[in-house]
Amino acid sequence: MFAAVLRDAWRQYRRRPLAAVITVVVGGLPVFLEPDDPVVAVPLAVLLLGAGLLVELFLVAWLAGALDPAPPSAAAALATMRGAIGPGVRAGLLRALYLLLALLVGLLLFGSREGGPLPESEQTKLAVGLWPLFGVAFAFLAVLMQRVVLGGERKVRQAAGASHRVASAHFPICLLIGLLQASGLVMASLVVEFWLLAALSILLALADPYLIGMSNALYLRTRAEQEPVDTGDGSLKPPRR
């Protein structure tokens, strides 16, 4: 499964090279935008978050289409994205909630017991401690957006349940995806030189379509495992693995 997911992700990345350009523009270049005025910074952050979510929904559909014998056009992927905006926003909020819970656990485990801003050494310690926690949070939602966009699921709780079942069955792959996704959040917490931060941001943006491709491949190869099984007495249980 692991080799197949990596292979399918590379096929998507190779056949949709413009996806990397899109993610660099939306997710990499904004690191050079550092407005000092909060009146500008807050709306800009909200705008970038919204744009990032829309781009993710679009790329899920567009990259997955590259695996089809007759790949659909970008216009078809845009239409799929528009139909998934509502549940996609709810899925994004659910993911933010998972990350918030991971952050709270991290602060309890690695945060300073004293008030005031953390010294540089404590910030590094907290960032390193948060990385696996964020990675696990992302891992359990590794195919959440795929369930919404590719599976047409409109109930986010059901999409999350399906993603949990995939993570339980294929946790090493999901954890790898989650740790790579979490690296961007951790990197932003580290105190590093700006040029290094900018280079890493662009590198992660270039890798983002490949991570989406991994989640797409995992979702498409595990669709039979995502539905609970009817036991015959009216109750449901997780599918056999």
List the predicted regions and their residue ranges.
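Hydrophobic alpha-helical membrane segments
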Residues: M1-R241
